[in-house]
A protein has these predicted regions:
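Non-catalytic helical/linker scaffolds that mediate oligomerization, partner binding
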Residues: 1-487
């Protein structure tokens, strides 16, 4: 069973019902809806199709709505793409002007206030670089240092500059409300700079009466500096290596990735490695050897998930890409899973200690599964963060929890009715593993749950169960005949 999860960005190449079903069947665990592109009604149709494909397959598939963020972009060029040569003067202005080879507008009206002579600006993910030579109230005059083509709406990065854009643009606020209305499982916040950035998101969620887990995208130097605080404040992180590799030296990105994964695991929060994991498969049916190694190394670093962007949104081989990624992950886990480092430190909280004890007992007993019954998914994530070789099952009465656990490493989920007694939990477990042929009579299962059942965050029980144990089944039958007051 593959443990690390696969996040797929949905786009024109994969938004049909047939392609979405094929993605799910190939191994997609999370569907990413990129609100930088496409219309709301198109994305609503995609979400509905993903839910149907998930139901058809019987596998939980989560929806991640990725907010565009305050991305700084060029405006349009009246005569199409322009070629900039070394030494050319190129002015970026806040004025409303037709774009030319010498002058173009920007979406960020605060640009002159944030720039100073000597600053280096990068266009189109660094394919073009310019140096600021003069700043006025409305214009940033630059000289071209790295030549190339510029065209409509290309991104503009200011490495090392603390840009004064808000955490949420007006479009982001609209898209956040839309994502909540669509019952998204995760919201990804772009260009996070500090732990405080989650406050604006939570304010809108509280206005709408619903909290959804928020993933912080690590793509700014300020976020790297505040990484521990961001991991603590948010519900998960994404190492967005595209903008991160533009804003920071390329050679710094691998260690940022490793540190981010370690911190997220310690906090028992999901961590995604994103951008160019299988980039060549946008055009080619096979990845490069370097890409295969990159994917495998993200798994060995301990990532919960790896993400595909253009490979599945606009690529020529989206289904093949997911199958290839799944095969690389499975091979890496099967042949090198022991290389995934254990996380440092001790578990100080009660639930963490219980989960650690359960994992050790399961290994000593050679148990078939580690099992958790969970309302919120917390105990499942606590088991997941240890990256133990024993397969893990999570049972929950909540579909929302089941879908959110689709992003967590190694968790196979089942939705079951809510019960009032732990013996009933064990009976449910026995029925599922036998009917699904997951375990044989006599197999040992190590269970983590809370007493009384149904209270989120109450994991306080560890139990060993033998599949098919008639005595425990009789206990369930006895409880079925009792009144609630006797439990």
């Amino acid at each position: 069973m593959r443990r690390a999860k696969i996040v797929c960005t949905i786009g024109p190449a994969t938004d049909s019902p047939e392609q979405l079903q094929a993605l799910v069947d190939a191994g997609m665990d999370v569907a990413r809806i990129n609100r930088s592109h496409g219309k709301a009604e198109e994305h609503e149709a995609v979400i509905e199709r993903v839910r149907k494909a998930s139901a058809t397959s019987g596998r939980a598939v989560a929806i991640l709505v990725d907010l565009q963020g305050p991305k700084i972009r060029l405006e349009t060029f009246q005569d199409g793409p322009q070629e900039l040569k070394i030494g050319d003067t190129f002015t970026i202005t806040t004025r409303d002007v037709p774009g030319t080879k010498e002058l173009v507008g920007t979406t960020f009206k605060g640009l002159p206030g944030d720039c100073a002579p000597g600053d280096r600006l990068l266009i189109d993910d660094g394919n073009v670089a310019v140096r600021v030579v003069e700043v006025t109230d409305t214009d940033v005059v630059t000289r071209v240092e790295v030549p190339g083509m510029v065209s409509d709406h290309k991104g503009l990065n200011l490495p090392g500059v603390a840009v004064s854009v808000p955490a949420l643009s007006e479009k982001d606020k609209e898209d956040l409300r839309w994502g909540i209305e669509q019952d998204a499982d995760f919201i990804a916040l772009s260009f996070v700079r500090s732990a405080q950035d989650i406050k604006d998101v939570h304010e809108i969620m509280d206005e709408m009466g619903k909290r959804i887990p928020v993933i912080a995208k690590i793509e700014k130097p300020q976020a790297v500096e505040a990484l521990e605080e961001i991991v603590e404040a948010f519900d998960g992180i994404m190492v967005a290596r595209g903008d991160l590799g533009v804003e920071m030296p390329l050679e710094a990105v691998p260690l940022v990735q490793k540190r981010a994964i370690e911190l997220a695991r310690i906090a028992a929060k999901p961590v995604i490695v994103a951008t160019q994991v299988m980039d060549s498969m946008i055009k080619n049916p096979r990845p490069t050897r370097a890409e295969a190694s990159d994917c495998a190394n993200a798994i060995l670093d301990g990532a919960d998930a790896v993400m595909l962007s253009g490979e599945t949104s606009v690529g020529a081989f989206p289904i093949e890409t997911v199958r290839t990624m799944a095969a690389i992950i499975e091979s890496t886990e099967e042949n090198g899973g022991e290389r995934i480092a254990s996380i440092p430190g001790f578990y100080a909280d009660r639930a963490g200690v219980i989960c650690e004890a359960a994992a050790r007992i399961a290994e000593h007993l050679d148990a078939r599964y580690l099992v958790t019954f969970s309302q919120s998914g917390t105990s499942a994530r606590l088991l997941s963060r240890m990256r133990r070789p024993i397969p893990m099952l999570a049972f929950t009465p909540l579909e929302s929890t089941r879908r959110r656990l689709a992003l967590s490493w190694g968790i196979q989920t089942y939705r079951v009715p809510e019960v009032q007694h732990t013996d009933d939990m064990v009976w449910q477990l026995d029925q599922v593993v036998q009917s699904s042929h997951l375990a044989d009579i006599g197999d040992q299962l190590v269970i983590v749950a809370g007493m009384p059942p149904g209270i989120a965050g109450s994991s306080n029980m560890l139990r060993i169960h033998e599949v098919g144990d008639e005595a425990e089944c009789r206990q369930h039958d006895a409880h079925q005949g009792e009144g609630d007051g006797d439990r």
